[in-house]
Amino acid sequence: GGRLLALVADIDPGTGALITAIFCILFTALAGMLSIAYLDVGNGLLMTFAVMLGVAFLVNDAGGLSIAFSELRPDQLSMFGDMGSQAALALFLPTMFLLLGEANMYQKFFSAKDARAAKMAVVGWIAGTLIVETLIDSIGVFGSQVIPGLGTEASEAIVISVAMQALPTVVGIILVCGASAIIVSTANSFLLTPATNLMRDVYQRFINPDVSGTQVLLYTRLMVVALGVIGYVAGNFFPTILAMALWAYT
């Protein structure tokens, strides 16, 4: 979030991170699961529409899909690129196991009204992940031709760079909004899930089984704030922890 605001609004990344943290913490604490679930639907639609629009404009500017492909390097069109099958598998397996064990997704699945809705949610999640991730990667690949010569650090923000430099203003704004939706949705889930687990699975189960529903709601909101502050401090003042988390997640 800090890097996104730094690129878009030209503010200090640290200030951007603080603004993002405050917004996400307050929103998650005040909204709760039901509101976040509905927000995630809107975020998902916005993400999908934004990346589809971005890819469509990049391909159109290149003169069509065949011309866009012809301008890519051979390794960009091969299955494993220049890394080989072993390195590709080393990236695939951790990501796969991460998704299979992502607690915030299971929390949403278990919140479904019935088994059929939960199964449909799983199918939609898998299909949506494949579609959106493929489109995001496509923006990165096609964008590397529009904005060549990016270093390692700059290439990590290529989606935002494409939105600001290569796309029409309206389309770029939509793509930036899609990126913002991804950040907010991820932060909401990563705050609400551990807070709920700590309250339901630890506090209510082992410490105070007779706690009322009103107290659970209040304590969960306070836990969201506490975890958000801890996460912000860990990410900004202990960079090695953030680096390991980013490595594990990406």
Per-range role (PLM):
Residues G1-T250:
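Membrane-embedded helix-loop-helix hairpins and adjacent transmembrane boundary segments
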